[in-house]
Amino acid sequence: IDNIQPHYTAVVIGSGYGGGIAASRLARAGQSVCVLERGKDVQARRYDLAAINKEHVVNPDSNYCFGEGGAGTYSDGKLYTRSKKRGDVQRIMEILVAHGAKDEILFDAHPHIGTNKLPKLVAELRESIEQAGGQVIFQTRVTDFLIEGSKLKGVRTQQSDVVEGRATI
């Protein structure tokens, strides 16, 4: 993998909303972050989705489940906010608004971003990670965890690259 550092504060596996928001918050806090995504970026992913729908050909690494933004990117755009393990839902909503969602999601009882808005939102989330000094690397599947003693030290990719971090998300 070009431009990969040997060690990061955090290695994030997957660029779904959870991984993207975690990486964005860490990068903006000045931490070194590397996001490893097995699928393609949101624009390139569209061609793989078209192949599924038109030709019935599925790329196992870039489809409705895998790729920038994860499974939520091509969902109906509804946000599930009723979890019993709430966390900081308001802060997450604010991050989504900062990256293109409408302000209404901050107070709607049933927040909805909209399918047509999600691809642009996830691309803007990636751009915010990169602008803050983080890296997002596509078409890179994590295949193994690197464990020394009882500590997780990093990951190995399908290309045999080793990516280490103090934390792995």
Task: Please provide the spans of the model-predicted regions.
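Conserved N-terminal/central alpha/beta ligand/cofactor-binding core
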Residues: 1, 42-136, 140-141
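Beta1/beta-strand and adjacent pyrophosphate-binding region of the FAD-binding site
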Residues: 2-18, 34-36
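Core beta-strand elements of the Rossmann-like FAD/NAD(P) dinucleotide-binding domain
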Residues: 4-8, 158-167
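Gly/Ala-rich phosphate-binding loop of Rossmann-like dinucleotide-binding domains
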Residues: 23, 27
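Short beta-strand "acidic-cap" motif of Rossmann-like dinucleotide-binding folds
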Residues: 31-37, 42
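A conserved short coil-to-beta-strand element within the FAD-binding core of flavoproteins
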Residues: 138-153
